[in-house]
Design a protein with these regions (language model features):
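A short, polar/charged loop-to-alpha-helix boundary motif
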Residues: 71, 124-138
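Membrane-helix exit/interface motif
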Residues: 62-65
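Acidic/histidine-enriched, glycine/proline-rich intrinsically disordered or flexible terminal extensions
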Residues: 136-161
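Core segments of cupin and vicinal oxygen chelate
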Residues: 11-57
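Vicinal oxygen chelate
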Residues: 17-18, 26-27, 54-56, 76-116, ...
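Short loop/turn microsegments at loop-to-beta-strand junctions
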Residues: 8, 47-48, 104-106
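Short, solvent-exposed beta-strand edge segments and adjacent coil->beta transition regions
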Residues: 4-8, 74-78
């Protein structure tokens, strides 16, 4: 018998899950599957569950208010966006930073809602784990200087062009 287990990411927002769901659906060309207002919850009258589908993954966002034991998001958990080319890197990088996100290093950023993302070109393993040790070292040094990853510069460092 086949296991049909499915994993859904569940994200707790203090008060803007609906807004965040719309933002992520627009960035990833996804869709909102459901938006349910919950009644009589300890979190108060503005508690919503919003389920969205992004790139064949399901996410449920809750507008749960401030609750003991639930903290803001941190970089300890991140979502990786695998990009086929630099054009996709540029698109996701600028889209996820829109409205107050903060860039970090090595392709990492935090969006305006506090979620951390890694925007990574598919070609990265070719240069960071390639057979040429000196090339790998140069590619790593080039990457460590970057916020948004530039695959051409990383390739050039690897190839020593």
């Amino acid at each position: 018998m086949m296991n049909s287990m499915k994993i859904t990411s569940f994200l707790w927002f203090v008060d803007n899950a609906d807004e965040a769901a719309k933002f992520y659906a627009s960035v990833f060309k996804g869709k909102i599957i459901s938006n349910t207002k919950l009644k009589d919850t300890p979190s108060g009258p503005n508690t919503y569950l919003v389920t969205i589908k992004l790139a064949n993954m399901t996410f449920t966002l809750i507008n749960g208010g401030k609750a003991k034991g639930f903290t803001q998001f941190s970089a300890a958990t991140s979502f990786v966006v695998n990009c086929k080319d630099q054009k996709e890197v540029n698109y996701y990088w600028s889209s996820l930073l829109k409205g107050g996100g903060k860039p970090s290093r090595c392709g990492w950023l935090t969006d305006k809602y506090g979620l951390t993302w890694q925007v990574i070109p598919d070609q990265m393993p070719k240069y960071l784990a390639g057979s040429n040790k000196q090339g790998r070292d140069r590619a790593m040094k080039a990457m460590l200087k970057m916020a948004k990853l530039d695959i051409d510069k990383i390739r050039q460092a690897y190839m020593e062009e």
